[in-house]
Amino acid sequence: KNRQFLEAFDPYDGPLYKYLDAEAQKAGFKLVMTLDTPFRSYAFTSRSGVESLESVRGVKVRVTMSPIEKGFVNTLAMNPCPVGWTEVYTALQQGTVDGEIINFGTFASFNRAEIEDRFLVTRHNMAKVFVVMNKARFDALSPEQQKMIIDAGRKSQMEEWDMSQEFERKGEEYCRQHNIKLIELSDEELAGIRKNLQPLYAEYMKDIDPVFIKLIQEVQK
C-alpha cells in the first residue's frame, strides 16, 4: 500500500475514484469517499505448529463465506473452515480452528495474544469501504453544497488513511511487546504464492471490467 494508492481515490483527479463514481451513478448513487482497512495476514495458535510457509499445510483456518478467501486458503494447502466472527475466539480456544485471517490492529484490539502466538505475514487481503449518497439528492444540491460534501469526504478519506496506518503500526508494536512470532516471507515465497494464485485470478477476473483491472494494476506498480 502506498501514497499513489490513496491518490488514485482522490475525488477530484483520482482515476479509480472517477471509474467507481461513474459506476455508482449508473445505480443511482454518488460516491462521496472511500475508506481503508489494513492489510490482513494469518495468525495462528501454538497448537497449529506453524513455523514457516511450508508448515501451514492442512492447518484449519477460519474464513468467511467468501469464495475468494476460501480459494486463497486452499492455494496455501490449508483447510478453510467458515466460522462467524463472534464465534472465532471460542473456536480458537477449543481447537475448532487453529488460525484466522486478521490484521495487526484488530489482533491487538481483540487481545488475540491471549490465544494466538504467531503471524504468517502475507498482507494479501484488504477491503475498501464505500460511502455513497443518493444521486438524486446530491444533484438537487447547489454546486457549493456539493463541493462541501465532496471536500469533507476527501478530508475524511485522507485522515482515515493516516489513522489506518497508525492502527496497523500500533498493532504490530503490540505483537512485538507480546512476543508474537512474526514469520516474514521472502520475495521468492511471495512470488510463488502469486504464481499459484493465477488460476484463482483467472476464475474471477473474467467477470471484472478489464478497464477497472488495468486501473488497479497501474497503482500497484
Task: Indicate where each model-derived feature is located.
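Core domains of carbohydrate- and sulfate-ester-processing enzymes
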Residues: 14-20
